């Protein structure tokens, strides 16, 4: 049995500025030690507010924030075992790489030998050994990020907070840094909490993801869980691309949408309950019209490099997005095939707690 240790806990935390609507509204969650977490959501959803509350840059309006078993609401930022890597890295331009990394240690008045040992070790961890005397202005974007991370880990924090640190990098470098950050977190064994609005970053890097919207956590779980089993339309639409249509759950393992009934793997709904149905674009296969479960007309097509993105319309006017390596032409009449496992049925207004209980009931039956 694997024993996990909770390092950070939010208990009914609300953050409100003046009389404005809450930025965070009664949020509760736990962060386990040694994992890579991502707070994911659109602008204004509350993800950066959570980061600042953990760091001590903001104070909660209501609720308790725990570090281990200790409430830290009133503990100032400089007394928390937490370091933040900011979006702009916040490096000192007048100091070289070595002095940037050593800055926090000098504030603590460590001996010169101890500072040198810690700085060299931090630079080795981020693959910047030999760059000690380099000026910050001479560093690339990726190298500056490594300096910022070295400055964070040199203080041996229990938690590292990363506030959209990849957003200023180009696509190729951003992808490279995703791998580097994930590898670094595994080697260090420190808890990372990463903020982003980029779902691909979240899926690629995280052990656990919290999806936020309008100050509330919509869903939490592993990348695979959230992608394959979204709890509601917002999560399904925000995490990857989705085809979402209205439907009706006829009975266990049978759902109706686009005026046809299909076998599915979902259960635990009321007979004839109104639901929403999700099918991912990559789970749709283009076939001849007569072999398809759905008959559609090709409306448009884009080449995306590794696949074609095909937009289709069925006889009722529903739009369907397909990812395929098969080339078709606009106005072609085609069929769309899919397996029962490709259909995901969502209950309207279901909470995450109710959703988890329903999934547990699946496991018990199986």
Curated annotation (Swiss-Prot):
Its EC number is 7.6.2.11. The keyword rRNA-binding does not apply. One of its GO terms (cellular component) is ATP-binding cassette (ABC) transporter complex. CDD domains: ABC_PotA_N. The keyword Transcription regulation does not apply. Pfam families: ABC_tran (PF00005), TOBE_2 (PF08402). Keywords: ATP-binding, Cell membrane, Membrane, Nucleotide-binding, Translocase, Transport. It is an enzyme of class 7 (translocase). GO terms for molecular function: ABC-type putrescine transporter activity; ATP binding; ATP hydrolysis activity. InterPro entries: AAA+_ATPase, ABC_SmlMolc_Importer, ABC_transporter-like_ATP-bd, ABC_transporter-like_CS, Mo/tungstate-bd_C_term_dom, P-loop_NTPase, PotA_ATP-bd, Transp-assoc_OB_typ2. The complex is composed of two ATP-binding proteins (PotA), two transmembrane proteins (PotB and PotC) and a solute-binding protein (PotD). This is Spermidine/putrescine import ATP-binding protein PotA. It comes from Listeria welshimeri serovar 6b (strain ATCC 35897 / DSM 20650 / CCUG 15529 / CIP 8149 / NCTC 11857 / SLCC 5334 / V8). The gene is potA.
